[in-house]
């Protein structure tokens, strides 16, 4: 059989399997008005039990809305199998998955080979797309069905990778608000898992044939939290309080995050959530692990993707120095190639600052993290430490 004929046959089988899986019913993407605008910003918070952290009613989180809505309830909840979850992060990543899916679907149907976008930072994301050899020979209905699935899978990967890049930037001092560095929130113990859940729920909502995107996210979020063993807001705060001076220090508005979650799925493809140890309300709970989004599903359908990040932020020089070889002058980050080295560098810096158990949720420190007053102070810690020192007693 000629090569072209084989390609058509393989693509045809892919499309047939998609139709069987979805029972010929398609989910609903964002409507044209929604798809015109990138997801709105939402204010997140740390998972600590300090004053400004929001703990909503875990069983009444309101209706999800891509646009502004007063019915949404955001903040930190606790689940027995998923640990603390930042609902704000989850909603943002669900929306970014939907937004990128809409844009990618359009680009694929137009045979675009270059796809670029920005998230909330200045960095530019670039995806070079190579199509199957028989792509243009498919009937339009089959092309659309395949493009929808490829767009959803690719959007999950891009959104999740973008959220990881945001955490990397904030670790190195990125100032999203333009004033104070966001270092304290970088890779805090609920971030990665919350982001991953958002991508998963967003993708599932886009495949829901019975509800529009917002209603689907509302229902899927409620179902996922219940499956993870969501707890009342009282337990969410108590769980955080139980790891004070262990996973974080501080009072009132001051907070210094010690426990960092650096598991983004690089080693085994799986993200394991951080569970609060010895929590009575969740005795014997087993963490619910989920696979990190990859390009495997896209590649299995005959597409090839080269994804790069072009950093524009001031912090880019620190990060690029990590990934450049002796003779390499790259100005772009390739996540598949470079994220491993960057995460290991961050882990080394975290261990130097907070001790060897910084990413081990079960190990307790030998001493109070606040007792080492002689430690070196980095610029990004100054605001937090100043508030902390003012609040602590003089003993």
Regions found by a protein language model. Name each.
Residues 10-19:
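Bacterial N-terminal signal peptides
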Residues 23-184, 203-366:
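Bulky hydrophobic segments
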Residues 167, 191, 197:
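Divalent metal-coordination and catalytic microenvironments
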Residues 172, 201-205, 386-393:
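Sec/Tat-exported extracytoplasmic proteins
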Residues 179, 194-200:
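Long, internal stretches of domain cores in catalytic or enzyme-like folds
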Residues 187-188:
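Hydrophobic/aromatic-rich structural module bridging two neighboring secondary-structure elements via a short loop
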Residues 364-395:
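Cellulosome-associated attachment modules in secreted, modular CAZymes
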């Amino acid at each position: 059989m000629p090569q072209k004929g084989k390609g058509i046959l393989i693509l045809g089988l892919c499309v047939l399997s998609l139709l069987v899986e979805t029972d010929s019913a398609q989910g609903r993407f964002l409507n044209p008005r929604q798809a015109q605008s990138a997801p709105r910003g939402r204010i997140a918070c740390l998972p600590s039990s300090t004053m400004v952290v929001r703990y909503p009613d875990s069983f009444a989180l309101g209706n999800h809305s891509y646009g502004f809505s007063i019915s949404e309830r955001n903040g930190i909840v606790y689940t027995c199998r998923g640990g603390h979850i930042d609902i704000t992060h989850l909603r943002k990543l669900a929306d970014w998955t939907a937004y990128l899916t809409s844009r990618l679907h359009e680009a694929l149907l137009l045979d675009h080979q270059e796809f670029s976008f920005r998230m909330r930072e200045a960095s530019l994301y670039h995806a070079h797309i190579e199509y199957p050899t028989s792509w243009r020979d498919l009937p339009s209905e089959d092309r659309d069905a395949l493009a929808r699935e490829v767009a959803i899978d690719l959007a999950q990967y891009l959104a999740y990778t973008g959220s990881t890049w945001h955490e990397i930037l904030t670790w190195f001092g990125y100032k999203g608000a333009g004033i104070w560095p966001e270092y304290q929130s970088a890779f805090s113990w609920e971030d990665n898992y919350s982001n991953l859940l958002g991508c998963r729920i967003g993708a599932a909502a886009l495949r829901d044939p019975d509800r529009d995107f917002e209603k689907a996210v509302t229902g899927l979020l409620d179902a996922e939290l219940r499956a993870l063993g969501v707890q009342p807001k009282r337990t969410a705060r108590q769980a955080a309080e139980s790891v004070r001076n262990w996973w974080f220090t501080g009072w009132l508005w001051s907070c210094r995050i010690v426990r960092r979650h650096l598991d983004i799925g690089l080693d085994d493809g799986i993200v394991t959530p951080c569970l609060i140890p010895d929590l009575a309300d969740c005795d014997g709970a087993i963490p619910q692990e989920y696979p990190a989004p990859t390009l495997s599903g896209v590649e299995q359908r005959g597409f090839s993707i080269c994804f790069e990040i072009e950093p524009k932020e001031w912090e880019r020089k620190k990060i690029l120095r990590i990934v450049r070889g002796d003779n390499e002058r790259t100005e772009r980050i390739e996540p598949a190639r470079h994220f491993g080295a960057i995460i290991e560098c961050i882990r080394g810096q975290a261990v130097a600052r907070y001790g060897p158990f910084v990413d081990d949720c079960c190990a307790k420190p030998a001493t109070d993290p606040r007792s080492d007053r002689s430690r070196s102070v980095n610029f990004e810690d100054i605001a937090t430490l100043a508030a902390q020192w003012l609040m602590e007693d003089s003993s």
